[in-house]
Structures are given as C-alpha cells and as structure tokens.
UniProtKB/Swiss-Prot annotation:
Lineage of the organism: Bacteria, Pseudomonadati, Pseudomonadota, Alphaproteobacteria, Rickettsiales
Compartment annotation: Cell inner membrane
One GO cellular component, as annotated: plasma membrane
The protein's name in its UniProt record: NADH-quinone oxidoreductase subunit I
Biological source species: Rickettsia felis (strain ATCC VR-1525 / URRWXCal2) (Rickettsia azadi)
Family: Belongs to the complex I 23 kDa subunit family.
GO biological process, one term: aerobic respiration
Keyword Endoplasmic reticulum in annotation: no
Membrane topology qualifier: Peripheral membrane protein
Length: 159
C-alpha cells in the first residue's frame, strides 16, 4: 500500500527535483577549460625545460645522472669537454612520447638544470614534434624561468 501511495504522488520525482534544487544554487565546481584554467600545484610535473644561469650560460654540466635514472630511457645526452676543462652537452634530447613524467630526472640533477615546468598544453600532431632537442628545452627554460624559479623555491624545503 505504501509503495502505491509513493508512486501515486510521484515521490521519486519530487525527491529528485528537491536534490536538483539543493545543488542548483551552490557555486559551480566545473570550469570552462580553454578560457578558464584551474590552479596548478607547485609540484606539478609538466613540459620539460633546461635552465640557464643569470649570465646566460646553460646549467647542465653533462653529468648524465638524469639519463641514467630515467626509467623510460627517454633522455639521450652527448657531451664534450671544453677548453677550460668543464663538460657541456652537445646533444640533449628528450622523447616526450616515452617520458612518464615521474620527475626523477629533476631530482637527480645536482644543479637544477632539467626541470619539469608548469605547461601542460603541448600536444602535437606528429611524433617528431614531441622529440625535444637542446634548443627547444632551453627555449622552454627561458620562457618559464620565473615560474620555474618560484616553483623550485617553494619546493626547496622538502627536497
């Protein structure tokens, strides 16, 4: 008898409409993605970048720790020795299709040369566009330097 009365008075529909009205006046949770962007954590791991010192010299000392620790073997480094005895990279390639964005390369780097920046919009139509060479990585570092420096500063006490 109770089920008959519930179905007669459309109890389920009224209950559903009440639930809809309850959430109708609350603030939105979703965002309009291409036009609005959600805040990104300081520990977010996005597009890779190579950093430079303030004088413009690249930070990478060609120790190859990032290449050795990369579980996906996405990093390839070739280096030569300079006239002053220091080593610098001649080739620094990252295959972004292999990268699993674990951040181990960033953690292994003793001079904070390779970092994962805040950019997450780097889709491409071709595979070759996702193989980053040294120049592209340095351009990313130059473009995101202020964001990268503040990100590293915020995370410094936890490293």
């Amino acid at each position: 008898m109770i089920n008959y009365l519930k179905s007669f008075f459309l109890y389920e529909i009224v209950r559903g409409m009440a639930l809809t009205l309850k959430y109708f006046f609350k603030p939105k949770v979703t965002i309009n993605y291409p036009y609005e962007k959600s805040p990104v954590s300081p520990r977010f791991k996005g597009e890779h970048a190579l950093r430079r010192y303030e004088n413009g010299e690249e930070r990478c000392i060609a120790c190859k720790l990032c290449e050795a620790i990369c579980p996906a073997q996405a990093i390839v480094i070739e280096a030569d020795e300079r006239d002053d005895g220091s080593r610098r990279t001649t080739r620094y390639d990252i295959d972004m299709t292999k990268c699993i964005y674990c951040g181990l390369c960033q953690e292994a780097c003793p001079v904070d040369a390779i970092v994962e920046g805040p950019n997450f919009e780097f889709a491409s139509l071709t595979h070759t566009a996702l193989i980053y060479d040294k120049e592209r990585l340095l351009q990313n570092g130059d473009r995101w330097e202020q964001a990268l420096a503040s990100k590293l500063h915020k995370d410094y006490e936890y490293r």
